[in-house]
Amino acid sequence: MIQPQTYLNVADNSGARELMCIRIIGASNRRYAHIGDIIVAVIKEAIPNMPLERSEVIRAVIVRTRKELKRENGMIIRYDDNAAVIIDQKGNPKGTRVFGAIARELRQLNFTKIVSLAPEVL
């Protein structure tokens, strides 16, 4: 469960290391975002000499949460961290690599490019 002011790790090589959520897209009064939701975030920590800089406002899709994700078959998945992948306005990832495992639910939400870049899909 991600809400405004939550810090997230960045799971790609776009140049940012840490994000802070400032808004959940498509939710006027929704409090929490889950895996597959798009958020507006600000970069809190970035790698020097990369295209993305600190305090830049970007969009990202959540790929991992510490809150459990329950599937229809009864399986429960929980990750070790909260992580997101930075995307552009069309929904394509800004980085060329994705680090760590991501949830299968992203494929159903039409983030197929992110799923194809991921080393492991759970």
Swiss-Prot record:
GO terms for biological process: translation. Its main location: plastid. It is found in: Plastid, Chloroplast. The keyword Magnesium does not apply. GO terms for cellular component: chloroplast; cytosolic large ribosomal subunit. It holds the Pfam family Ribosomal_L14. Keywords: Chloroplast, Plastid, Ribonucleoprotein, Ribosomal protein, RNA-binding, rRNA-binding. One of its GO terms (molecular function) is structural constituent of ribosome. PROSITE patterns: RIBOSOMAL_L14. Disulfide bonds: none annotated. It comes from the Eukaryota. Part of the 50S ribosomal subunit. Binds to 23S rRNA. Belongs to the universal ribosomal protein uL14 family. This is Large ribosomal subunit protein uL14c. The lineage of its organism: Eukaryota, Viridiplantae, Streptophyta, Embryophyta, Tracheophyta.
